[in-house]
Regions:
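Conserved alpha/beta-hydrolase catalytic His-Asp/Glu region
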Residues: 18, 30-34, 168, 172, ...
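Conserved HGGG/HGGXW glycine-rich cap/lid loop of the alpha/beta-hydrolase fold
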Residues: 51, 56-100
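Short glycine-enriched nucleophile-adjacent loop
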Residues: 139-150, 156
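Short beta-strand/loop motif that positions the catalytic acidic residue
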Residues: 247, 253-255
């Protein structure tokens, strides 16, 4: 009996010590850089629902708003924007929790809230309507905007939209503290980001050290880790069923044929569910169509928006 009690006590002490070690690992120093030190000449900020939202504005003509995907930023549009500024006014923004925008630790990061934030952004810049362009998670966000305020949407352009697939594994939703934060730390390491990008690009040569470093910059801004942890716990395993059939705006869907991001059946399903939508397949291209095939994307956008 005494031996059993000692074993149980030893096990309990061991578990407590392990838990304390995990907490220490989760909260190891995480160096951050103030956003103000990262601002360039093209960067602008505007308050939306009490949050500072980062965006850029370039060009002249019909208005296009570009919305990045999960763990992305305005950086993903660096090749696309210069090809459109002659004929379009391009707004590229960082959604809440990413890029240089605010990252409240307890923010509302579900796609409906992000879609509403996009409407708030348009209100703030006094833009009545625009064509919305969304990549991956951004495709879901702009769809939510269309559902909430169809009169504000001229057309939708969805690039590898993240419908019906989980942003992160479902088990993360049930991870107890502090394992959730440890997983978030791991996701925001350079090695993980490199692996993520290499798995998403068809042309691996485009995933250079410079590109990886640029993608890492927003992960080192204040509250980035806290926001990601909250995001993964609250919305990471949602698949957003039932949204596509309610979309009313003219919609263009682009799919990279060699990507691991969005399976072909998802693109085809969306095409069948969104009434009157057009599906364009991009050959020899992965998940990041805007970075691998910007010229083809621009051609498709011009033909669709004209």
């Amino acid at each position: 009996m005494k031996r059993t009690r000692k074993i149980l006590l030893g096990t309990l002490i061991g578990l407590v010590l392990l838990y304390l070690v995990l907490i220490i690992i989760a909260y190891l120093p995480y160096k951050t850089t103030p956003v103000k030190e990262l601002i360039g000449k093209e960067d602008k900020f505007i308050e939306v629902d009490g949050h500072a939202i980062h965006y850029t504005k370039q060009g002249q003509g019909k208005s296009l708003i570009l919305v990045h995907g999960f763990a992305g930023s305005t950086y993903t549009w660096r090749y696309l924007i210069p090809l459109l500024t002659d004929d379009y006014t391009i707004y590229a923004l960082d959604v809440l929790g990413f890029g240089l925008s605010d990252k409240p630790p307890d923010g509302n990061y579900d796609m409906k809230s992000q879609g509403d934030l996009l409407i708030g952004f348009m209100d703030a810049i006094k833009l009545p309507s625009a064509t919305l362009v969304g990549h991956s998670m951004g495709g879901v966000i702009i769809a939510c905007t269309d559902l909430a305020a169809p009169s504000r949407v001229d057309k939708l352009v969805m690039i590898e939209p993240g419908f019906y697939i989980k942003t992160v594994p479902a088990f993360l939703k049930y991870m107890f503290f502090p394992l959730d934060r440890i997983m978030s730390r791991q996701f925001y390491t350079k090695s993980m980001r490199k692996r993520f990008l290499l798995g998403s690009f068809y042309d691996k040569s485009k995933v250079t050290e410079e590109v990886i470093d640029a993608y890492m910059i927003p992960t080192r801004t204040p509250n980035a880790l806290d926001a990601l942890t909250h995001m993964m716990n609250s919305v990471g395993s949602q698949t957003y069923e039932g949204i596509s059939v309610k979309i009313s705006s003219p919609t263009l869907i682009l799919w990279g044929e060699r990507g691991a991001g969005v399976p072909p059946e998802v693109a085809k399903r969306l095409n069948s569910e969104i009434q009157g939508s057009k599906l364009v397949s991009v050959k020899e291209c992965g998940h990041y169509v805007q970075e691998e095939k910007p010229e083809e994307l621009v051609k498709a956008i011009r033909n669709f928006v004209k």
